[in-house]
Design a protein with these regions (language model features):
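Collagen/collagen-like triple-helix sequence repeat recognition
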Residues: 21-124
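Positively charged n-region of N-terminal signal peptides that target proteins for export
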Residues: 1-4
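N-terminal targeting leaders for non-cytosolic proteins
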Residues: 124-252, 261
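Terminal, low-complexity interaction segments
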Residues: 295-374
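Short coil-to-beta strand junction motifs in C2/discoidin
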Residues: 280-299
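Short amphipathic beta-strand/extended segments with alternating polar/hydrophobic composition
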Residues: 78-87, 116-124, 129-131, 259, ...
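C-terminal motif of bacterial Sec signal peptides marking the signal peptidase cleavage site
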Residues: 15-19
Length: 374
């Protein structure tokens, strides 16, 4: 691009030296140069976006050939168009920074005009939706259920508290689920006991008026609609109950894991407060006061490899002061945990949310649409 500006400067200087003459050809060249400078500016912006994608750990989930190059679709839902020449031809010096784009089964290889090569991984994203239409697991039984579990909605208990699936007369429930044939993620209730042990339960419950939410509506959220309270208007989602700190009697942090014991990157999922937790943070309850300016409440996600070693930890703020309490499905990036066999999700709160026996705020959050890289 430097030579464009050099030529432009020389051309303009020649005008001052030669005086009056027919300059239409010169201005035509200048207009062409402006177009080339603009094109190179767009290339610089595209290159910056590619570097940013690599730095943020994004991977390509799909490609689409366009008239002038490629459209790349990334794992976070964003896309980027790369022009590598006119009408599909390879880019030439002065035409594009991008000389060629090569696609393999696992990568997209971009060659720049100076010979440098950018290689971006390409993966398949599989999503755990909890929707009946996406079921791939085979039928199975759990002790508290008088019918076979054939679809996700069969795992939704009624009533929400004290029901047969999650409590089974307050004895062993064996409540568990496995997204077999898809993401291979699995979870359930810790030690197979009642839901107060902590764990992950499927739900579709919705409360428009969260002000009456309590432990009896522990599986409800107040985002979406009664027809679709899940992320993006879907019906079903999952609710975690439980946490561990130095005051609680529990020792196992709720988690999900890959049932086939293969390490994978969990790219992201969507989370929100349950109605019960949201009501407590907004209005307080018999155990906890409403959130103040300095109140915080967060999910702490920790990844583990197959040998049980920690890979990394990341956090999501469910409450960051009284004016920032989450009540919409919000993306939680988990890709920074790297390849994991298991992820634990602990709930941690500020001092005003805790008492002599641990958290006073209801230890729940809801999640949906867990995206896994394959």
């Amino acid at each position: 691009m430097k030579r464009f500006f050099t030529f432009l400067a020389v051309a303009l200087m020649s005008v001052t030296l030669t005086g009056c003459y027919d300059d239409s050809d010169l201005w035509g060249e200048i207009d062409n140069l402006k177009d080339q400078v603009q094109a190179n500016s767009e290339d610089i912006a595209t290159l910056s976006s590619l570097i940013d994608a690599l730095n943020k750990g994004k991977v390509i989930t799909g490609t689409e050939q366009t008239e002038n190059g490629y459209k790349l679709m990334f794992s976070d839902g964003s896309s980027l168009e790369i022009k590598n020449g006119t009408n599909g031809a390879d880019g030439a010096d002065g035409d594009s920074f991008f000389v060629s784009i090569e696609e393999t089964d696992t990568t997209v290889i971009i060659t720049l005009a100076d010979g440098r090569v950018i290689t971006i991984p390409k993966v398949e994203i599989r999503t755990l939706t909890f929707e009946d239409a996406d079921v791939k697991f085979t039928s199975y039984a759990i002790p508290g259920c008088g019918y076979p579990i054939e679809k996700w909605s069969d795992l939704i208990d009624n009533p929400q508290y004290g029901g047969p699936l999650l409590y089974n007369d307050y004895s062993y429930t064996g409540y568990e689920w496995h997204d077999a044939g898809n993401t291979e993620l699995a979870s359930g209730i810790i030690d197979g006991g009642a839901y107060w042990n902590g764990g992950h339960a499927i739900s579709n419950y919705y409360m428009e008026d969260f002000s009456s939410a309590s432990y009896e509506t522990q599986l409800a959220v107040s985002t979406g609609t009664a027809e679709g309270a899940g992320h993006d208007g879907s019906k079903n989602f999952c609710v975690q109950n439980g946490y561990v700190d130095d005051k609680s009697w529990k020792t196992v942090i709720p988690y999900f894991y890959f049932a086939d014991n293969v390490e994978r990157v969990v790219d992201h999922m969507y989370v929100t407060n349950t109605s019960y937790a949201y009501n407590s943070l907004m209005n307080g309850d018999g155990f906890s006061t409403p959130a103040g300016d300095d109140t915080w409440y967060k999910i702490v996600a920790t990844g583990y490899d197959v040998e049980g070693n920690v890979t990394a930890t990341t956090e999501f703020m469910l409450c960051d002061g009284k004016d920032k309490i989450v009540n919409e499905w919000t993306k939680f990036d988990l890709s920074c945990l790297g390849k994991v066999a298991k992820i634990t999700f602990n709930l941690v709160g500020s001092a005003d949310l805790s008492g002599d026996y641990g958290l006073n705020c209801p230890a729940y959050f809801a999640y949906d649409d867990v995206a896994v890289r394959f």
